[in-house]
Amino acid sequence: MISRRVLGRGPERILGLCLGLMAGPVWAGDNDVIGQALELPAHRALIAKRQRPDTELRRFETDGCSGGLSEVWRLVADQFEGFARTYESIPPWESCCVTHDQAYHNGVNAPDARVSFAARLLADRTLEACVTDMGITRRDELAEVYGITPDQVETAYATIGGAMYWAVRFGGGPCTGLPWRWGFGYPDCSVLAGDDK
């Protein structure tokens, strides 16, 4: 269901969001000409918005892992002591998400759209690698905690890292109106409103 908040921003926001979500999987590669063609206008719009004299970067805030993952994890851990004791009170990879949010906050202040595109791709790949590496470095410890083999821990964390990568590639582009978008520290922008000109 589309929230009233999104609907209240006008039809161009909804269209932009839909186009961005449909195009998400296409721009997974840094050499993907079609993906860049779809996403670069939004990066240009973000940079144009950022360069306006009245645009201010908001203070950095993080929700941990977006999409409600950290919030739900904490809720479950608060309600079920055994869950927190076994699986920790925050997602074990939350530090990876916070680092990712720091890059997304200001879009690394990229000077142009291609640099912004590449920086976002790097941030997303770094998130995936961070989660995957955590499964490798903590494999023996977590295998004992979870009651599975170390190889299963590595596979699980690689799967989680991959899913997180695709989620942020799919829904994290600039100018989507989403709170976890690339450049979320700046006011939202819109390709359809001419911010990319």
Language model features: what each stretch is:
Residues 1-8:
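N-terminal secretory signal peptides that target proteins for export/translocation
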